[in-house]
């Protein structure tokens, strides 16, 4: 994946969090003052508005000239397309590797919706602990202004560092487990968001670029499946208690870092071969 593509997905990721920031605050306020039914109704209404905006704006979307050229070229077989087809199993294998590693990462990251809220309620005695979730989109938007969001010097290094960053976030909680200071929680969100910014846009770009364009939707579905599996794992860990979840997440992050470091050891060679076949 190119640096430009990584920056494009970083902007998409930041745009999503533009909506996440106010929604976490408004949702928590509605739940606290009017109850869960009103909060869920507001979320449903906002979703309908988003779908309506998408449908209205859909008519303005037009296929780009590059898409038309790509369709025309794909109609005629060539040595390049045959070479790319021969690489298909290896590329789908790399997609699977990325999604497995991402699932391990998301098990830890999605603790922000479970374990971190329990931690805030028990340690900080907050009436609306959901408000701390706004720290995540806020950090995403701030980090989007830094070179970190578009940095792609080494793919494997970036993915490993993402796991290390969120692992450090849980290590920070272990250090401050007997403290009631909100700074520990803020530190967790900052480190976890650094990991998210390193991995999420790059991962989306990689799974899309590794497969033919006609299979991009399927590859993205696998990526989102890894997010869903991570959320399920986060829920299971949260049910075991804060202490268990924090320690287990730290171990999972270590496993994810090792997974990326080992499984992507031939990543450079593979991407080099793919570029040669596309020249």
Regions found by a protein language model. Name each.
Residues 1, 197-212:
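Intracellular juxtamembrane helix-capping segments at the cytosolic ends
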Residues 2-6, 10, 22, 27-127, ...:
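Intracellular loop-helix junctions on the cytosolic face of multi-pass helical membrane proteins
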Residues 6-32, 44-50, 133-137, 220-235:
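Glycine-rich segments within core transmembrane alpha-helices of 12-TM secondary carriers
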Residues 8, 38-43, 158, 219, ...:
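Alpha-helical transmembrane segments of multi-pass secondary-active solute transporters
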Residues 21, 110, 193-201:
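Small-residue-rich segments within alpha-helical transmembrane domains of MFS-like 12-TM solute carriers
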Residues 129-152, 162-170:
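Transmembrane alpha-helices of Major Facilitator/SLC transporters
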Residues 159-199:
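C-terminal transmembrane helical hairpin of 12-TM major facilitator-type secondary transporters
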